[in-house]
């Protein structure tokens, strides 16, 4: 597994959860002897929704809502068998989406 690289992409609505999960992954990887590149903050996606408050008239009365999706990227270079086992056993927060790719 010395020539492989593990790329981890994290997505979450709450930046505190994603930063905490990223720190857990980095600590786990470094403890098992792997090199870590990152965390690299990727652009935050902002989705805005406008909703009419009034059911019939007053088109000017509106509410605006926003959902922010925060993203982070981690590269684990030269992972060992211990690194892969430790990452599989790692329990992350429920609000964090994790995508792992080997390359």
Curated annotation (Swiss-Prot):
Transcription regulation as UniProt keyword: no
PANTHER family attached to this UniProt entry: 30S RIBOSOMAL PROTEIN S10 FAMILY MEMBER
Keyword Ribonucleoprotein: yes
GO BP annotation list: translation
HAMAP family linked: Ribosomal_uS10
Name of the featured protein: Small ribosomal subunit protein uS10
Keyword terms of this UniProt record: Ribonucleoprotein, Ribosomal protein
InterPro entries attached to this UniProt entry: Ribosomal_uS10 (IPR001848), Ribosomal_uS10_CS (IPR018268), Ribosomal_uS10_dom (IPR027486), Ribosomal_uS10_dom_sf (IPR036838)
Species of origin: Marinobacter nauticus (strain ATCC 700491 / DSM 11845 / VT8)
């Amino acid at each position: 597994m010395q020539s492989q690289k593990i790329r981890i992409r994290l997505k979450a609505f709450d930046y505190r959860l994603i930063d905490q999960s990223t720190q857990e992954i980095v600590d786990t990887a470094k403890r098992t002897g792997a090199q870590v590149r990152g965390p690299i903050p990727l652009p935050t996606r902002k989705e805005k929704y406008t909703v009419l408050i009034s059911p019939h008239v007053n088109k000017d009365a509106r509410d605006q809502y926003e959902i922010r999706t925060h993203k982070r990227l981690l590269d684990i270079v030269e992972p060992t068998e211990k690194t892969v086992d430790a990452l599989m056993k790692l329990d992350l927060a429920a609000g964090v989406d994790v995508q792992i790719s080997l390359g």
